[in-house]
């Protein structure tokens, strides 16, 4: 058994309710066309080459949930290649519905833990990264499983271009305190809270944001820039 808190093996559910016929069909037929194969330890990937039309820049979303945010970003920015990482099959299926309905050609998916993909990407290859409403892992003994973690931030700092943006949002008070503390302490990121409550203009909404508001938990929205090399 591993003792490494940042071991990339997934902790949590991979599947929820049984998929409907359309969703299962998209998993069977569309996902294989969009999926990024898991790289080996020594593999290196050119993210620009993953797309049929070379994008102006590449953005990454880690844990895209139901895919509302990722699909909206991809639709609004057709010149950008958007990579989404998600392990939950039902969330992947929801995103595939958006991709199919919007005929998005600039989306690629990694249906595994993002930490298995990131080491294979080259330095300064991402313009933006999004971590929207991640699993808060509220128990203290599980805090090392949180994606926003010093070691993961080291990796993201390597991947982001100078002044590249990392957006993180959460409605969990414990996670908010954690992410603000960890990000503020990291020497290669500069930024902070953009809004506590209302979603910033131009940031697409998600089902998790809507649920947070319904349940009386105002989200905190943060933006961080990669300090120049």
Where are these regions (language model features)?
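SAM cofactor-binding core of SAM-dependent methyltransferases
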Residues: 57-116
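S-adenosyl-L-methionine
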Residues: 1-60, 68-75
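A short glycine-rich, Lys/Arg-flanked "PGG" loop and its adjoining helix->strand segment in the class I
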Residues: 148-162
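Class I S-adenosylmethionine-dependent transferase superfamily signal
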Residues: 129, 156-157, 166, 179
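Glycine/threonine-rich flexible loop motifs
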Residues: 139-147
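Class I S-adenosyl-L-methionine
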Residues: 175-177, 181-229
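A short acidic, Gly/Pro-enriched loop at the edge of an enzyme's catalytic core
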Residues: 119-128, 133
């Amino acid at each position: 058994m591993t003792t490494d808190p940042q071991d990339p093996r997934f902790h949590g559910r991979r599947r929820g309710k049984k998929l409907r016929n359309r969703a299962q069909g998209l998993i069977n037929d569309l996902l294989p066309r969009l999926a990024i194969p898991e790289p080996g330890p020594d593999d290196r990937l050119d993210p620009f080459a993953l797309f049929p039309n070379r994008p102006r820049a590449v953005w990454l979303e880690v844990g895209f949930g139901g895919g509302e945010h990722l699909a909206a970003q991809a639709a609004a920015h057709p010149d950008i290649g958007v990579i989404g990482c998600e392990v939950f099959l039902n969330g992947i299926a929801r995103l595939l519905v958006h991709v199919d309905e919007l005929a998005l050609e600039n989306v690629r998916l990694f249906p595994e833990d993002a930490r298995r993909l990131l080491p294979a990407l080259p330095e300064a290859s991402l313009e933006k990264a999004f971590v929207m409403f991640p699993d808060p892992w509220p128990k203290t003994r599980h805090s090392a499983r949180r994606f926003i973690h010093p070691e993961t931030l080291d990796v993201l700092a390597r991947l982001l271009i100078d002044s590249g943006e990392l957006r993180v949002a959460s409605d969990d008070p414990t996670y908010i305190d954690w992410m603000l503390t960890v990000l503020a302490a990291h020497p290669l990121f500069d930024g902070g809270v953009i809004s506590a409550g209302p979603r910033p203009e131009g940031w697409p909404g998600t089902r998790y944001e809507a649920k947070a508001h319904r349940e009386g938990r105002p989200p905190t929205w943060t933006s961080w820039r990669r300090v120049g090399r």
